[in-house]
Amino acid sequence: MKTLSAKPAEVQHDWFVVDATGKTLGRLATEIARRLRGKHKTSYTPHVDTGDYIIVINAEQVQVTGNKALDKKYYRHTEFPGGLKETNFEKLVAHKPEEIFERAVKGMLPKGPLGYAMIKKMKVYAGSEHPHAAQQPQVLDI
């Protein structure tokens, strides 16, 4: 019996919606990364994008454990000398709640063209509304 290798034209990408209300950031991000990569499918192939589309709603209501809300630092650089900026989890949730999920999940995906295609399949929204009703996403309880 031969090992089956998925071909890009044969892969079916489903749409799922995940509610982040009251969920822990890391545990939710690992499951999202696994589904974006397609490792939950029997047709998983490392060099083919077999993952699903994930819509994350209520990103502003995600939680972290311990003192990470104040202690966890996020860094960015303005590309000017001395332009290193830092913020903590609490401030970033108030300002850009979508960026928290993008940073958490992006670090769990492969680097390179395939990983960049996978991260584009994740749509994150701060509130409970999303514009993807036409795709008829299924509710995914994590």
UniProtKB/Swiss-Prot annotation:
GO terms for biological process: negative regulation of translation; translation. This is Large ribosomal subunit protein uL13. Belongs to the universal ribosomal protein uL13 family. Part of the 50S ribosomal subunit. It comes from the Bacteria. One of its GO terms (cellular component) is cytosolic large ribosomal subunit. This protein is one of the early assembly proteins of the 50S ribosomal subunit, although it is not seen to bind rRNA by itself. It is important during the early stages of 50S assembly. Keywords: Ribonucleoprotein, Ribosomal protein. It comes from Acinetobacter baumannii (strain AB0057).
